[in-house]
Each structure stands twice: as structure tokens, then as C-alpha cells.
């Protein structure tokens, strides 16, 4: 290299080559780790194996810078200039486009440099960040395309080493098309600049270290903030707890240096607590049971009811607990009715729910009997004779209580009035044919005798004199044999002798 050239004609590449040559000649002959003496000439040394990359952290870069600046107190690594070369003069980073810097490519790998920022003007503290016009013209094609300069983004961040602030870090992005009435265009060139001290701005002439890379992928540094908001929504606004029942979802992300080193290597584990699984299963299970019960009711031919008339509260409780909450006189179909009807048609009860289904079956028949009882008392059609002779209400309820000995048997008196009258007429006609001679003197039909037998003693006195005591006896006899409705002998003898 010709060192007799004037200082103004020395380029940045010549300075770097001189530094590398000087380091090779004056380099250490010992291994910095074990102290082993290295034999052979520097040109005989082999390089590092393929795949080895120089990717120091922020703290490590500050330590290298501190060792470079404070050479008396800290000993710099003998090979540090091989990985972080120093650029001086007007060919520095603040003047040269990143593509013109030695070793910088667009493959996303980062390159590190020691350099000294310069002022934009002779007076003031503003730093020069404008790229040289000549380089800008060669890249853009014309001078009318605007200026190209580094623009700081974000705030200056402190760099902590062992709990103490050793330096500061600022991030700059390269923009093009700067100028009046122009809209700057952002490029993918990024620079991280580090300087020593606690002040946000570096001192004049101070040596700094910068990392430059071409960002090949969108930055993902804000990914953790978006996931923290998701954690606040899913986990109740705080850090996800590891206990409390229910599972935890673990999301792992390795940021690495996929964007060319824009994000430092780190791993983040975000725990998102989902809602209680039992509540979800209860709610979904209750809805599925409701749909299944409605489908079973339609298949069994049961009357359809609105969803608000069915009792599905709460979903997680068994059907017998729901039965205690329901009032049997409401007249609406409950969940037990639907399930019992489905059980009766399928005839395949589950072994785990046989006890509950038997209880529901008994409750279902009892409720059907009560509903029919209410329907008979309310909607019983009025007979013309009943408007003249109406039996007492107490007698009617007494007969029902006497006959209600079997809860699974529907008695004849609980059937509709039309079927009851038809059966009684057919039975009375058969008895009249069988006892034609015996019943020849009767002037009333069998149905009228039945109604007359259920009347009070005063009515019997009006029809036939002197039969008040006999009417009470007939009333007791009718209550005793009300299931078969035979004609009492006393009444036959009375009519025969009358």
C-alpha cells in the first residue's frame, strides 16, 4: 500500500486494509484464552469455520467499545479489529451509503464498525446524518430525487451492564427523498448506534460503535406488546397465573435475528389463561341436552313448548335436583317429562342413570295423573241433567281419594265424560235385558238411577216418600262399589215393591 499519498486521497478501504495489515504484523503469537504459542506465519492461518457469525449483544458491544476507548484500563481482544473495523474520515458511516461500506450486504447479516460522528455544521450540536450527494446520485440516478439521510426513530435507550448503566443506544433508519414538498420514503437499512456514558447524545469526537444491517423481514419487536394485551384480555388484566385450576396455553417464540439483528435474541413465553373449562362444558352441554330433549319430544309425539317454558337451570345439576325446583302444578313440560318419555320409548336406560330415570318415570306418571285430574275438574262438559241435579263437591273428591289407590292406574272416573256415559249406557242396556222381569217396574233409566243415587236425602224424599234412611244407605253402597257401578239390591227391591 502506498502511504505517501496525501491524506485527502486516502479512501476508507485503504484505511481498513492498513489496519488489518498492521494487526497481522503486530498480532499476538499466543492464544488469548490458554496462552498457547502460535507457530507459523499469519498468512498460513486458516479462517473461521463456515457458519460462525459475530452477533454480540448490546452489553457485549458496550464492553468492546469500552475496551477500545479505555485501552489503558481495559485490554482489548487481539482479534477485535477483525470483526469490528474502525472507519475514519469523510468516508465514514455518516457520509457513505451502507452499500458502499466494506462487508455490508443485503442478506440480512449485520456488520459492526467503530467510527466518530461528525457535526452537521461547524457551530451547534446537530450531528451530520446526510449521505454524500455523489453516492446518492449514483444510486438514485438523478440529483432531483431528493436527499438520503439517517433519521432517528424512538427514544434513546440505556444499556445496563451488571445493573449499572454503561452506555446508551439509539436506532436510526435510512430515508430517501428528503426535501421540501417531498414525502420521505423509508428504506430497509437500519443502524443501531452505541456510545458510552449516561447522556442521550455522544460527545464531540467520541468513538462509537454501530451495527448496520438490511432488514429482510418486517420488524417483530412489538410482538410482545400485542401478546401482553391478549394476556390482559384472556387472563383478567394481569400476568397469567400458573394455578387456579384449568389448563394454561403456552405460546413460545424465538425472536432470534430473523430480521437481520433488529431484535436481540430472546425467548418469550406467554401464558394465557382461558375461561373455566367446566363452565364452558356446562354451558355447551346444557345447550346440547336442550336440543336433544326437544328432538326426542318431537319424535315421541309430545306437544312442543317454547324454550322459556322448559327448565334447564342450572345445567350442571342432575335432573332430580331440577325436579325439586319445579312446581308440578305449572302445567308446563319440564326436562324430566321429556327425558322420561324418551326413556319409555327407547327402553334402553343407561346403567349409570337408572336410579334417576326410575325416579323421573314415577314422577312423570304422578304429574300426568295430576294434570288429568285438573283437566277433568276444569273442562268437564256440562250434561243437561247435571244442571238440575249437581252432586256435592266434597262427595266427588271423596270418591277420587277412595279410588286413588294405585298411582299407575287411570280410573274410569278420570276419563272424559263422553266415554264414561257411553260405557254406562251399554252396561245398563245389558243389565236391563238380563233382569227384564226384575226391572220391569222401573220408570227411570240406569243413568238417572246413578245420578239419583248420588243425590242428597232431600231429593230422595221428593221422589219417593219414606226413603230418606234408605238413600243414605244407597249412597254408601254406591261409594263402596263405585268401580263396577252395579245396581244395589235395596234399590231394586224398593222399585219392585213400590
From Swiss-Prot:
GO BP of this protein: cell wall organization; positive regulation of DNA-templated transcription; regulation of vegetative phase change; tracheary element differentiation
Residue ranges with Gly residues bias: 233-248
Superkingdom: Eukaryota
GO molecular function: DNA-binding transcription factor activity; transcription cis-regulatory region binding
Ranges of biased composition (kind: Low complexity): 256-266
Localization in the cell: Nucleus
Binding region for DNA: 166-221
Entry keyword annotation includes DNA-binding: yes
UniProt keyword list: Activator, Cell wall biogenesis/degradation, Developmental protein, DNA-binding, Nucleus, Transcription, Transcription regulation
Any single Gene Ontology cellular-component annotation: nucleus
PROSITE patterns for the chain: NAC (PS51005)
InterPro entries named in the record: NAC-dom (IPR003441), NAC_dom_sf (IPR036093), SOG1-like (IPR044799)
Bias-annotated ranges (Basic residues): 356-374
Residues covered by region (Disordered): 225-278, 338-374, 423-443, 457-498
Domain notes: The NAC domain includes a DNA binding domain and a dimerization domain.
Biological role stated in the UniProt entry: Transcription activator involved in xylem formation. Promotes the expression of the secondary wall-associated transcription factor MYB46. Functions upstream of NAC030/VND7, a master switch of xylem vessel differentiation. Acts as a upstream regulator of NAC101/VND6 and LBD30/ASL19.
Protein name per the record: NAC domain-containing protein 75
Organism: Arabidopsis thaliana
Amino acid at each position: 500500500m502506498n502511504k505517501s499519498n496525501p491524506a485527502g486521497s486516502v479512501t476508507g478501504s485503504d484505511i481498513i486494509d492498513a489496519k488489518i495489515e498492521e494487526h497481522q504484523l503486530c498480532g499476538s503469537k499466543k492464544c488469548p484464552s490458554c496462552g498457547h504459542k502460535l507457530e507459523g506465519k499469519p498468512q498460513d492461518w486458516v479462517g473461521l469455520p463456515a457458519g460462525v457469525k459475530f452477533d454480540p449483544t448490546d452489553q457485549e458491544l458496550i464492553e468492546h467499545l469500552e475496551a477500545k476507548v479505555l485501552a489503558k484500563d481495559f485490554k482489548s481482544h487481539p482479534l477485535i479489529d477483525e470483526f469490528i473495523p474502525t472507519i475514519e474520515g469523510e468516508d465514514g458511516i455518516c457520509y457513505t451509503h451502507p452499500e458502499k461500506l466494506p462487508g455490508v450486504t443485503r442478506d440480512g447479516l449485520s456488520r459492526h464498525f467503530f467510527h466518530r460522528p461528525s457535526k452537521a455544521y461547524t457551530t451547534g450540536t446537530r450531528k451530520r446524518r446526510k449521505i454524500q450527494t455523489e453516492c446518492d446520485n449514483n444510486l438514485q440516478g438523478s440529483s432531483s430525487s431528493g436527499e438520503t439521510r439517517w433519521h432517528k426513530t424512538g427514544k434513546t435507550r440505556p444499556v445496563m451492564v451488571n445493573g449499572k448503566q454503561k452506555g446508551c443506544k439509539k436506532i436510526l433508519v435510512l430515508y430517501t427523498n428528503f426535501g421540501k414538498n417531498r414525502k420521505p420514503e423509508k428504506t430497509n437499512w437500519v443502524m443501531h448506534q452505541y456510545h458510552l456514558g449516561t447522556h442521550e447524545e455522544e460527545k464531540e469526537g467520541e468513538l462509537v460503535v454501530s451495527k448496520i444491517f438490511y432488514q429482510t423481514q418486517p420488524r417483530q419487536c412489538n410482538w410482545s406488546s400485542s401478546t401482553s394485551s391478549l394476556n390482559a384480555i384472556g387472563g383478567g388484566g394481569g400476568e397469567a397465573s400458573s394455578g387456579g385450576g384449568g389448563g394454561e396455553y403456552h405460546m413460545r417464540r424465538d425472536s432470534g435475528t430473523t430480521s437481520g439483528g433488529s431484535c436481540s435474541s430472546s425467548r418469550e413465553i406467554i401464558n394465557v389463561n382461558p375461561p373455566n373449562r367446566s363452565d364452558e362444558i356446562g354451558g355447551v352441554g346444557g345447550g346440547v341436552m336442550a336440543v336433544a330433549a326437544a328432538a326426542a319430544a318431537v319424535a315421541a309425539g309430545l306437544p312442543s313448548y317454547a324454550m322459556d317454558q322448559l327448565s334447564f337451570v342450572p345445567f350442571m345439576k342432575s335432573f332430580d335436583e331440577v325436579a325439586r325446583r319445579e312446581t308440578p302444578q305449572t302445567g308446563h313440560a319440564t326436562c324430566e317429562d321429556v327425558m322420561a318419555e324418551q326413556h319409555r320409548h327407547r327402553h334402553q336406560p343407561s346403567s349409570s342413570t337408572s336410579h334417576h330415570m326410575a325416579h323421573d318415570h314415577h314422577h312423570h306418571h304422578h304429574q300426568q295423573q295430576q294434570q288429568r285430574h285438573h283437566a277433568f275438574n276444569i273442562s268437564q262438559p256440562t250434561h243437561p241433567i247435571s244442571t238440575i241435579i249437581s252432586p256435592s263437591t266434597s262427595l266427588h273428591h271423596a270418591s277420587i281419594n277412595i279410588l286413588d289407590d294405585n298411582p299407575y292406574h287411570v280410573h274410569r272416573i278420570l276419563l272424559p265424560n263422553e266415554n264414561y256415559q257411553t260405557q254406562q249406557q251399554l252396561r245398563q242396556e245389558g243389565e236391563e235385558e238380563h233382569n227384564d222381569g226384575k226391572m220391569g217396574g222401573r220408570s227411570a233409566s240406569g243413568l238417572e238411577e246413578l245420578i239419583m243415587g248420588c243425590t242428597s236425602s232431600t231429593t230422595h224424599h221428593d221422589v219417593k216418600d219414606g226413603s230418606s234412611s234408605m238413600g243414605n244407605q244407597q249412597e254408601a253402597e254406591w261409594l263402596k262399589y263405585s268401580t263396577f257401578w252395579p245396581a244395589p239390591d235395596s234399590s231394586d227391591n224398593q222399585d219392585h215393591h213400590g
